[in-house]
Amino acid sequence: MFRQRTRVLFLISAMLAIGLPVHSATPASGTLSGIANPVNWSGGPYTAVATDTSSCTTLNCDTFFLNINTSAGFFTTNSNDEVQIRITWQGVTNEFDLYLFDPSGNLLASSVQSFETFEEIDAGPLPNGTYKLVIVASQTVNVSYSGTAQIAADPTVANGKARYQPGKMTFGTPFELPRPNDPANTVTTLVFDQDVEPRVVHDSLGNLYVAAIQGVPGGVDVWKSYDSGKSFTYLGQPDGTQVLATTGLTTGTGLGGGDEDLAVGTSGNVYMNSLWLGSTTQASSFNGGSTWIVNPLSSDIPADDRQWIASYGNNTLYLTYKQLGTLLNGTVSIVVVKSTDGGITFPQITQVTTPVSGVQPGDQGNIVVDPRNGNVYTVFFDQTSTQVYIARSTDGGVTFDLKLVYQGPADTSLAHVFPAIAADEGSNLHIVFSDGVNTYLTTSQDLGATWSHVVRVNNGASTRTAIQPWVVAGDSGKVDITWLGSSSTNFLDSSAQWQVFMAQSQNGLASVPTFAQSTVTGVIHVGPVCVNGLGCPSGTRTLAEYWAPDVYLDGNALIVYPDDKNSGLASGAARTWFVRQTAGPTIILTVQ
């Protein structure tokens, strides 16, 4: 597909050089007054390239004026009806984008996607007035489009539709989390100079904790904020405690740092787990990170990968990981172990996937515990990376049942990179994942028994590609979804410019959810982002594979992410940066 796009761009450039006629929508306007009167128009043919509405000329954009003129109280009487707008064209290598502006000229909604032959806006019940539709020929060769606007019933069952609006969330100035320049924590090689795959969590007092990996055996760096994220104090490497006796260093270098995860208990216990070559190291602090008790063999079984932890109550901690074949003679399986003493020991061991279950796991996402009922959930792909599964336990992790959440196309990989799951305050579940082009959301309102139709989350010319998604849940049906986005349609594009994005949904359980999207950062990386783990070519995996945000006590988003563009390291390594939401809607309406 990328080679096809390159040929298309070459052809567009050649045709633009000889000059093209100006086109306009036919007709130029239309009126919707009721359900039985759809409006149709068309435009083109276009051979053009355009970024978005800011680059519009008469050669690459079309304008259609839509008049809404319904009777008084029409949408009150017809409460399930909405304005639906759709454009279609031929050929997935062509791209048109669709923008809707209100009578005052403000961007109201848009539909911008890639590798499709349509754009669609579900605009909701619009007040009477004249609205402007802008159709952008973002990448087209001698192709026309057809448009339709109608008033029709809102779907009562989720069918993949969503509404996309500009976000009103604003964010502060991002800053890097520094670490001391001492021999214990700064090594001159790329592997150890980095701090990637960060996670941020908070406790009930408002303290923030951040952890990020240097890479095996560089260890895990941990920071704490006492002032709601205005500043951070470096706490050292909790997994370094296990080698203090042999190194004689005051802070201690880590033995792990392959992967990490971070969690807090209800009374403030802090848990950090670090992957090393033999097992995982569980570091637990019962005094706010001042000191740590360390178990370097917390997985109980050797040969592990990509571990995750989740706390429940004050002293219960679940640890899950992908076991690489020790148990089943080379067969990969998912294991969950449980501690009831704050991570000091893990006596309960449960094998989640077995050959009998008929599911061979691929990449595994995070583990969560619903604090309202104690149910335990983890999410994973199958070995082909075309299926999404959850594993659910309703008996404290003793047994798990598996449920297929989503079956993707046979020729599409969903491993870009980990799926992520969250439980909201209503015990609803939310899963996000990426197919390398878009980030998708699916939800469950019955404890994981059934799942909604997947819906695209990212929207807009600046994020035609969306990878490395994560989801954080708040009140019932309310979620923040973050991802790494680029205007390029190929995540291996050597010139792609990547930014952090966040979409918020206040009605994630609706048949047509609404996503309000904001850009969180400037450019944090230029070039390809490989998602093939250790199989990636050199220099394409500097951002590693994930970053996990949080939502604070006041409902504002807390976001940590890797950045190799603004850190300024001579090695080109990425460091961990932090940014906090400063204004706008939140997913927790009742401040804790």
Regions found by a protein language model. Give the residues of each.
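C-terminal PAP-associated
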Residues: L32-N80, Q90, A152-Q592
